UniProtKB/Swiss-Prot annotation:
This is Transmembrane protein 237. Pfam families: TMEM237. It is found in: Membrane; Cell projection, Cilium. It comes from Gallus gallus. Component of the transition zone in primary cilia. Required for ciliogenesis. The chain crosses the membrane at residues 213-233, 254-274, 288-308, 344-364. Keywords: Cell projection, Cilium, Cilium biogenesis/degradation, Membrane, Transmembrane, Transmembrane helix. Residues 1-135 are annotated as: Disordered.
Length: 394
């Protein structure tokens, strides 16, 4: 019992009996593998190869390969099964599908892939044509060879302008010449009706300008009317005022209408003359009088004539109510007519001279208007320097 029991040596397994050639299926000749590689390395290389193929850019789907028939595996005895599986692992993973494909079929698939890659530039070119506008016009230099163009691509040509253009008229498209159409469109001037907003300053300037035009006609008419009035008075009064009674009898019907019209025209002319000077600034108005400005002189003469004509209004009332001194209720006494009418005739003569002189001064420079200039000046000061130049140019 003290001695250790020695185990008998391990017996080798029985050598399998070699079967006949009919029982063992024929297999492809075994490829030599490089030293230092194991089946696991082959599996890793196959998986990396499949990932690289999947990472390639998308290409059009290859043509469908007809399904391949699976080869029936014959049953192999258990002792030869291990060696057979080791031989076929590399071929199974090389296909990636687990299907053993012969070499001839593998070359066909590779050729089909190369053909599909040739059609790839044509598809990318067509997508670029839709995105880039500069490539829409194809020149002769950039034309591709017929081998590179896709089979089913539409024919492309050089884009050139057509001489005729189709224009829609009365719900129908009619052909028209491009040159004539361009000429007609250039000759049409489209005027936009822009309604500018009026301010109080614009209204004041428009009224001022319109009243200045009316004043010009009034000045001329008043000068002519004053000359006519004084001529009629002297004709009716006679030489050295010998026929004063004749003047009173003939002129009493014209005293009120003539003097009223004269006063109206004189007042309009006076206001129009004062509108041409700036009375808001006394220094400017005084400087105009001292420098003999035509507008300042005309306004002064009109104002003087207006005061003189108003001073003789009572005499005009007495002329209108004239009755011979011999009649009862007459306000005229015998021998006093000449003394009353002589100052009235002289005043009318002076007024006529003043009105005529004012008209001459204003007609010398009718566009002279200091009020309008000052109003524009204050308006321009509100704008910056750039806008001032624009307004002056207008």
């Amino acid at each position: 019992m003290g001695k250790k029991q020695v185990c008998p040596p391990r017996a080798l397994p029985p050598v399998p009996s070699f079967c006949s050639a009919d029982d063992i299926p024929l297999s492809r000749p075994k490829k030599r593998k490089p030293k230092g590689k194991t089946p696991l390395d082959d599996i890793v290389q196959a998986t990396v190869r499949r990932q690289s193929e999947s990472s390639e850019p998308l290409t059009p789907e290859p043509q469908d390969v007809p399904p391949q028939r699976k080869r029936k595996k014959k049953k192999v005895p258990p002792d030869s099964e291990t060696s057979f599986t080791q031989q076929n692992t590399a071929s199974l993973f090389q296909n990636g599908n687990g299907v053993d494909v012969p070499e001839a079929e593998e070359t066909v698939v590779r050729k089909q892939r190369k053909r599909t890659k040739k059609a790839r530039p044509a598809e990318t070119h067509s997508s670029n044509e839709l995105e880039v506008e500069e490539d829409d016009i194809i020149e002769d230099e950039h034309r591709r060879s017929p081998d590179q163009q896709p089979v089913f691509a539409a024919p492309t040509g050089i884009s050139q302008p057509v001489s005729k253009v189709f224009v829609e008229k009365n719900r129908r498209f009619q052909a028209a010449d491009r040159a004539e159409l361009i000429k007609t469109t250039e000759n049409i001037n489209v005027l936009l009706d822009v309604k500018s907003s009026w301010t109080t300053r614009d209204v004041a300037l428009s009224v001022h300008r319109s009243f200045r035009v009316i004043g010009l006609f009034t000045h001329g008419f008043l000068a002519g009317y004053a000359v006519w009035n004084i001529v009629v008075i002297y004709i009716l009064a006679g030489n050295q005022l010998t026929t004063v009674s004749n003047l009173l009898q003939q002129y009493k019907m014209l005293a009120y209408p003539a003097q009223s019209l004269f006063y109206l025209l004189l007042s309009i002319s006076t206001v129009s003359a004062f509108d041409r000077i700036d009375l808001a600034k006394a220094s400017v108005a005084l400087r105009g009088f001292l420098t003999l400005d035509p507008a300042a002189l005309a306004s002064f003469l009109y104002f003087t004539a207006l005061i003189l004509s108003l001073s003789q209004q009572m005499t005009c009332d007495r002329i209108n109510l004239y009755t011979p001194p011999s009649e009862n209720g007459s306000i005229w006494t015998a021998g006093m007519e000449e003394e009353i009418l002589q100052p009235w005739i002289v005043v009318n003569l002076v007024v006529s001279i003043l009105v005529g002189a004012s008209w001459i001064f204003l007609s010398y420079r009718p566009e002279l208007d200091h009020s309008e200039e000052l109003m524009f000046h204050t308006e321009i000061e509100e704008f910056p320097q750039d806008e001032r130049e624009m307004l002056k140019s207008q």
